[in-house]
């Protein structure tokens, strides 16, 4: 089941922490913003997105909410 969340990365430190958490996951995650899709574990990819607004994060597996809670705005849906 795919989990989709909207998150906000407000600062450079938020991006660094988010990438670190994504690198610890045993599965991949993708970040979507305005038609672009990047790997959540790639810091340069994230910085290429418009981070002034929420971005959509898509996970291929269930995740531990404690890892993502600081960035979460709202849960969109499960697919």
Label each residue range with its predicted role:
Residues 8-10, 60:
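A structural detector for beta-sheet-dominated domains
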Residues 1, 25-27:
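Short, surface-exposed connector motifs at secondary-structure boundaries
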Residues 31-34:
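Cytosolic Rossmann-like ligand/nucleotide-binding regulatory domains
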Residues 50, 54-79:
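C-terminal structural segments of small proteins and small subunits
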Residues 12-25, 36-51, 70-71:
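Amphipathic alpha-helical interaction surfaces in cytosolic regulatory modules
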Residues 1-8:
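Short glycine-/aliphatic-rich beta-strand segments at the starts of folded cytosolic domains
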């Amino acid at each position: 089941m795919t989990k989709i969340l909207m998150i906000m990365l407000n600062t450079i430190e938020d991006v660094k922490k988010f990438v670190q958490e994504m690198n610890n996951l045993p599965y991949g995650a993708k970040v979507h913003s305005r038609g672009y899709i990047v790997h959540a574990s790639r810091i340069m990819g994230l910085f290429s997105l418009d981070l002034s607004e929420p971005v959509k994060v898509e996970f291929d597996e269930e995740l531990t909410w404690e890892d993502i809670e600081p960035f979460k705005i709202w849960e969109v849906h499960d697919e």
